[in-house]
Regions:
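A short, Lys/Arg-rich alpha-helix, primarily the initiator
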Residues: 1-13
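Short alpha-helical DNA-recognition segment
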Residues: 15-34
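Alpha-helical residues within the helix-turn-helix
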Residues: 12, 23, 52
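DNA major-groove recognition helix of helix-turn-helix/homeodomain DNA-binding modules
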Residues: 26, 43-54
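Residues that mark the N-terminal boundary/hinge immediately upstream of a DNA-recognition element
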Residues: 6, 17, 43-46
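Short, conserved catalytic or interaction motifs in soluble domains
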Residues: 37
């Protein structure tokens, strides 16, 4: 499982929407969707926030 599959699985397993996680990261939902699709690399600060959140 690569990182994009993992962040999606974590989000879905916890019943969170992309919008909720995007709000946590202070980004738009479309940007977060791009993270899950692998279209955009996740900045380190966002990875740290995700790790602390989950």
């Amino acid at each position: 499982m690569d990182y994009k599959e993992r962040i999606r699985a974590l989000r879905e397993d916890n019943d969170y929407t992309q919008s909720r996680i995007a709000g946590l990261l202070n980004i738009g939902q479309n940007t977060y969707a791009d993270y899950e699709l692998g279209k955009t690399r996740i900045p380190v600060d966002s990875l740290i926030k995700l790790a602390q959140f989950y």
